[in-house]
């Protein structure tokens, strides 16, 4: 079935996105972790896997109720490591400086370009359809891009 979605996302006013020191540390720490969907790994000297802000996009940080999110996060686990994310943070401190969480490894998943920003990536495919790609039987494609 062919499907098309059109919608408008309303983000709060925010400064131009820059890479924080924490983001750079996070990217370095995760660079050899495999793609969450297809298990593709980077090889030495290559950086084709990327990190994706999973729970909270950086541009949305100023419009998040961090105390409410912190309560929710107590029961959340990182998709790739299985570690609880909520207990690692002082959410009152995150409320003062959201970057503490937003650019941390706990808010990131590692994706290859195809499953991140490609036609079948998380930035283009609704999550319920995107996640199916992780569990497909061999040689079956749930999301095929444009036909």
What is the predicted role of each segment?
Residues 20-85, 112-114:
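Short cysteine-rich loop/turn motifs with clustered Cys
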Residues 60-66, 70-147:
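Polybasic, low-complexity binding patches
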